[in-house]
């Protein structure tokens, strides 16, 4: 994924920091384990703002100072599949645990990458959800179409990545909103904390809503 993303960025103002695989669940881990993770400490150093924790186990990471943040947006970009969503959640959890002010002050965003590329003659549409794909196909009913599904960033060529994910004029960003921090804490704890029974109950009560998103391959 790094190759296509790096080739599609504008190096004048966009920096790319790869995260290889799933990072540590920072909600369940103690600080000693968190700051032994090179992936996490490297990410914090790239951000430049330090961490908001009171512990001597932060290695050489500085105390949090928003003025030292090197970027005006922190954008999480992952594959458009269940593994990508989990990685996205783990990165959000890391920021929430170590640098919550970034969320509170509105610096954190999620980049949406398209699920489908739909081509009709010499024109191309991008669909970010199955519902969008259905709507586009319906509008083009009767015409010869080519529909390609893309689940991984590495499968997208740089031109497509620039148009859909990197170009500020055409990309889609979801701003992570801090409107209710108490509710945010409850959700993070439910999904990633130690409350196993609560998580089971939540899945039992709400799992049916997401059956179409299950990856059973």
Describe the role of every protein-language-model region:
Residues 1-217:
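Conserved phosphate-chemistry cores used by DNA topoisomerases
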């Amino acid at each position: 994924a790094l190759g296509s993303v790096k080739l599609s960025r504008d190096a004048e103002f966009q920096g790319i920091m790869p995260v290889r695989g799933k990072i540590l669940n920072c909600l369940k881990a103690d600080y000693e384990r968190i700051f032994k993770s090179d992936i996490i400490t490297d990410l914090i150093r790239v951000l430049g703002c330090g961490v908001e924790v009171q512990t001597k186990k932060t290695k050489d990471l500085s105390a949090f100072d928003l003025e030292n943040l090197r970027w005006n947006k922190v954008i999480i970009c992952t594959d458009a599949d269940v593994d990508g969503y989990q990685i996205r959640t783990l990165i959000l959890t890391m920021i929430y645990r170590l640098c919550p002010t970034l969320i509170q002050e509105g610096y954190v965003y999620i980049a949406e990458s398209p699920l489908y590329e739909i081509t009709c003659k010499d024109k191309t549409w991008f669909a970010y959800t199955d519902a969008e794909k259905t709507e586009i196909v319906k509008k083009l009913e009767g015409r010869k179409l080519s529909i390609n599904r893309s689940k991984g960033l590495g499968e997208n060529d740089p031109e497509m990545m620039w148009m859909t994910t990197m170009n500020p004029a055409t990309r889609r960003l979801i701003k992570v909103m801090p409107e209710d921090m108490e509710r945010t804490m409850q959700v993070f704890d439910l999904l990633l904390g130690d409350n196993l029974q609560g998580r089971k109950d939540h899945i039992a009560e709400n799992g049916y809503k997401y059956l179409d998103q299950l990856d059973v391959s």
